[in-house]
C-alpha cells in the first residue's frame, strides 16, 4: 500500500498498517538501519524510529549492539508457532470430539489457556435442545471452569499464582471459588484424580468434566470437556464419562507427540 493510501486511512488504521509495513520490511533483511528502512516503507525517519522503539519495548524488535540497525526477534516466530500448534491440535481433536459427541450426545469443548482465562478453540454442540450456550472464541475464568482447572493443575504453583495474580474473582453462583488460596488445594485434587469438575460453579444448572491434553513435551496445552445440564447428569456415570474423556485425550496427546498419557 502506497504512503498516500495510508494517509487516507483513519489514524488508528493508518498506524496499524505502518507497523505491519515496518515488520514486513524487517522480515526481508537480517538487519536494517533506520535510513534504509524509512526509504523502503516511505515514512519519515522520526515516524519509523517511534514505531521501532515501541516494538522494541514490546519485544518484537531488537537493536544490534551499539549500531543503529534493527532486526526482528523470535517473538513473532513464537506467535506463529503457537497458532500452528492450535491448528494441529484442533485437527487432531476433531475426530475424538465427534466420537465423544456420538457416545454422550452432549456438548464437547476444547479449551486453551490465554493469559488469565480459558478460550474455547473448538466445540461440538449437544444433540439435545437443552444445552450449554457457548461459542468458539468465548472466554471464561480459569477458577470456575473444569477446563480452567486442568489447565492450571499441572503447572508449577508459582506459575499458577503468577497467572492468577491480577484475576478479579467473581462469584457467578453460590459454589464459585473466590480466592487463589481456596483454589490451590482443588488443583492438587484435580492433578491426583486426573480430571477437573465444574459443579454449577460457572453457571447454575450446568455440570462439566474436563481432562488434560498434553503436547510432545508433556505440557498441558488444552482441556477437553463434556458439559451437561444437571438434570441429565448421572453421578453414577461420572467415572464412565471420565474414562471416555481420557481415551479421547490420550489419542489427541499421541497425535501431538506425547505417548506417556498418565491416565
UniProtKB/Swiss-Prot annotation:
GO terms for molecular function: DNA binding; DNA-binding transcription factor activity. Residues 89-258 form the IclR-ED domain. Pfam families: HTH_IclR (PF09339), IclR_C (PF01614). Residues 13-74 form the HTH iclR-type domain. One of its GO terms (cellular component) is cytosol. The keyword Cytoplasm applies. PANTHER family: HELIX-TURN-HELIX TRANSCRIPTIONAL REGULATOR, ICLR FAMILY (PTHR30136), HTH-TYPE TRANSCRIPTIONAL REGULATOR KDGR-RELATED (PTHR30136:SF7). This is HTH-type transcriptional regulator KdgR. It comes from Escherichia coli (strain K12).
